[in-house]
Each structure stands twice: as C-alpha cells, then as structure tokens.
C-alpha cells in the first residue's frame, strides 16, 4: 500500500469567503424596505451572498425582475465606494462608501 501526501495548499489560491451584509447594514436596508412596503411600493425582497458581491433585491411583485438592487462590493471600497443602488435597467443610480447616503436615491 502506498500513501500519497496531498500537495501543499497555497492560501492565495483559496476561494475568498462570501460577501454578506452585516447587521447594521441590514438594519438600514430593512428600515427603508419597511417604509416602502407600508407605502405600497415594494412587496418582496431577496438576498444573495456571493464571493464578490452581496445583493439585496427589491421586487414590486414576487415573480418579476427586481426594481432595485442594493449591492455591496468590498473590492471597490477604495475606488468608487463599495455600496451601489442599481435600477431595473442596470443603470447605477448611486454609488458610495456610506450606505446611509447611498440609500437616499
């Protein structure tokens, strides 16, 4: 019987952990969501946590494309800001480093 040792693991090649919204960020987003639901504008939401981006999608109805997407991309922290609000057509409505100001679209 022969034993094979696994090749060394290069930490730089390890997949990065997924990006997620932190509790204070979700509190801001859900506060806005609650106000818009009460106004009858929004009805549903979805959250996606991927490797490079976390997305909070807002829907008018469950079975349609999102009206808005609130994205968090930490790699853009030093450049354009890691938060962005994107419209239904894919246009970036607002981008910045502070989520509270970005949500004032």
Which role fits each region the language model picked out?
Residues 2-4, 14, 68-90:
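Short aromatic-glycine-(Arg/Gly/Cys) micro-motifs in beta-strand/loop hairpins
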Residues 4-54:
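Negatively charged, low-complexity tracts enriched in Asp/Glu with abundant Ser/Thr
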Residues 51-54, 61-66:
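Short, charged/polar surface micro-motifs in flexible loops or helix N-caps
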Residues 57-59, 84:
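Residue-level detector of beta-strand face positions
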Residues 63-68, 91-95:
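Short, surface-exposed beta-strand/loop "edge" segments at domain boundaries and coil↔beta transitions
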Residues 84-105:
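Mixed-charge, glycine-accented linear interaction segment located at domain edges/termini
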């Amino acid at each position: 019987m022969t034993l094979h040792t696994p090749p060394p693991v290069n930490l730089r090649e390890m997949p990065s952990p997924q990006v997620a919204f932190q509790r204070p960020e979700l509190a801001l987003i859900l506060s806005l969501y609650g106000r818009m639901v009460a106004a009858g504008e929004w009805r549903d939401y979805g959250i996606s946590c991927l490797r490079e981006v976390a997305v909070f999608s807002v829907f008018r109805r469950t079975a349609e494309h999102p009206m808005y997407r609130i994205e968090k991309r930490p790699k853009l922290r030093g450049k354009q800001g890691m938060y962005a609000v994107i419209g239904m057509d894919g246009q970036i409505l607002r981008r910045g480093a502070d989520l509270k100001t970005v949500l004032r679209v």
